[in-house]
Amino acid sequence: MKLERKVRLCSAAAAILIAAIALTGCGGSTAASASTAASASTTVSAADNSCGEGVTWALADGTLTISGTGRMTNFTKDTPAPWADQADQITTVEVDGTVTSVGATAFKGCTALTTVNIADGVEYIEAGAFNGCTALTEVNIPQSVGYIKTGAFKDCTALTSVTIRDNCRLDMNVFPSTVEVNRAEG
């Protein structure tokens, strides 16, 4: 009886070990494992349309729409926006007014982006949010935006003018030096 139990236990342990080796790809092709991991990651990113707690994104016909309630995620070089691999397809960004912030580096490097519409209700734009959007020519910043952080529109070389509310706080180097910043009462 004890011997039979030990045999079953050893068999179960061997099965778990074999499954673990198969799942980690030990002894297999590294390129195949990396390719499989990249595909799984892409699938997860495409299926997960979250870009903040209660905030989602959708890309259709070149328009990236950010909607929901709350703050967008602040993205980084190590954790890029989930649409980063489609950045060259984005021509318009629409941010709904129930979203309270535009996340850091959210649209960085969207070189085909020409128009940004931020709805009234958004309170601030994080650092580097639109950095490197070299085709950007039109930005609609509502009166609700009270703070725009460093480099939010850095290297947006096609942008010539923007209008923001009079008491909107600007960090350093928010816009390229060639951009005319107009202040409106609000």
Predicted regions and their residues:
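Bacterial N-terminal signal peptides that target proteins for export
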Residues: 3-13
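Structural signature of tandem-repeat unit edges
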Residues: 9, 62-70, 87-101, 111-124, ...
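Bacterial N-terminal signal peptides
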Residues: 13-24
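Sec-dependent signal peptide cleavage junction
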Residues: 22-47
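N-terminal segments that cap or nucleate solenoid repeat domains
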Residues: 43-95
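A structural signal for leucine-rich repeat
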Residues: 175-176
